[in-house]
Every structure is written in C-alpha cells, then in structure tokens.
C-alpha cells in the first residue's frame, strides 16, 4: 500500500512507500510502488525508484517503468527521463508502446511528447492487429510517428503484409524502400522494391522496382510510379 504522498505541482502527485528529500540539492527520491499522477493531463507513470530534480523539473526513473497516457496509450520501458514542463518522456532502452487499436510499437532510443502524441524512435517495429489475424509488420531504421492520426515519416523501411492480402496464403508479400511516409490509410515508399515470393523457398526470384510504391491499406492495392 502506498503510505506517502508528495505534491510537486498543482494537480500533480507522487505516491510511494517512502521518500527521501535531499534539501541542499533540492532532490526528492521516491522508492517502492511509485506512482506519478496528473489528473488534468490524464496520465499515470509507475515504477519502483524515481528521483525528482526540482531545479531542472526533471524526473529520472530507475528500472522498469510504465506510463498510462490519456486512456489511450501504454508505454513500457526502463530508465525513463521525464521532463515535466515539456511533458516529454525519453529512454535509450528498449520500449513498447500499445494503443487502443491493437497496434503495438517496439522501439529503441525513443522520445515521446505527451501533449502532441508524437514519438521519435530508432529501430522501430510496428505490428498492426497485434496477436490477431491479418497482421502487418512495419520496420523503420528511424521514424517520427504521430499516434493521434498515424501520420509518419521514416528511413530504411520494410513492410511485411499479411499473407492473404492478395488471396494467396502461400505468398510472403513485402516491400522495401529507402524512406517512407504515410498515415492510417496508406504508405508511400521511395525507391521501393516489392516481391511476394515466399521466403526461403524455391520460388523464382522476382521483384518490382519503382521510384515510389503506394500501399493502400483500405483498398488493399499497390500502385507503382516509375
């Protein structure tokens, strides 16, 4: 049970089993069942060891940390840096972001703006319809993604489309491009290459190369622009 509470700003609270205040450095350390709660901006951040640096308005967590944001997103990471005034979360550790639409993001070295609902990350893997049928996978070397409307820009892109998108479950349709952009309805890959040849099979190798390839997620089509 949380038996201590500290108010670090109006409508913002830190709950923990114990606190240690280093007065001469203006630092507050919270230990055990730590929870940051902001009732106005609707987020909760939990973990086991948080250090609040009052002068810099910064909180650094140690170990596994979870953030529940605006009743829409759950972030699981470790060793997070939380810039309070900017409402920004960041970590160089591996991170998982889940939304309410069965979409999951795995990333490293991420930065997330709570207010803008935008995150930047490296080695990003997005899985749509997570643990459900007709799941697609998007790989980005690095990307900037708006979680609110799914708009994104990315470098070094690879998409693995669910097998039966073209009514053939034997296919392994996939697209690669040096960069990409898109939203919840489509993805455009630049200098793209497409193949549906099954991986690790004796399928005759073939591919379509194009200046741009547009993957329409709604119509389930691919359009090429040479």
Predicted segment positions?
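Structural signature for solvent-exposed beta-strand/loop edge elements and short helix-capping sites
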Residues: 1-226
């Amino acid at each position: 049970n949380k038996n201590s509470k500290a108010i670090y700003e109006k409508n913002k609270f830190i709950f923990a089993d114990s606190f240690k205040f280093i007065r001469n450095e203006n630092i507050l350390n919270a230990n055990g069942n730590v929870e940051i709660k902001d009732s106005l901006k609707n987020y909760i951040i939990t973990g086991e060891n948080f250090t609040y640096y009052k002068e810099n308005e910064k909180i650094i967590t140690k170990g596994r940390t979870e953030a529940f944001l605006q009743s829409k997103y759950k972030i699981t990471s470790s060793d997070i840096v939380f810039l309070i005034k900017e409402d920004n979360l960041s970590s160089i550790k591996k991170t998982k972001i889940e939304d309410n639409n069965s979409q999951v993001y795995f990333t490293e070295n991420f930065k997330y703006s709570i207010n803008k609902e935008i995150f930047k990350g490296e080695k990003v893997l997005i899985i749509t319809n997570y643990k459900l049928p007709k799941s697609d996978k998007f790989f980005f070397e690095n990307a900037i993604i708006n979680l609110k409307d799914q708009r994104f820009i990315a470098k070094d892109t690879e998409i693995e489309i669910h097998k039966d998108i073209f009514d053939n479950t034997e296919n392994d349709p996939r697209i690669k491009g040096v960069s990409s952009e898109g939203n919840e309805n489509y993805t455009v890959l630049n200098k793209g290459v497409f193949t549906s040849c099954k991986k690790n099979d004796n399928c005759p190798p073939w591919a379509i190369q194009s200046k741009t390839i547009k993957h329409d997620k709604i119509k389930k089509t691919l359009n090429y622009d040479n």
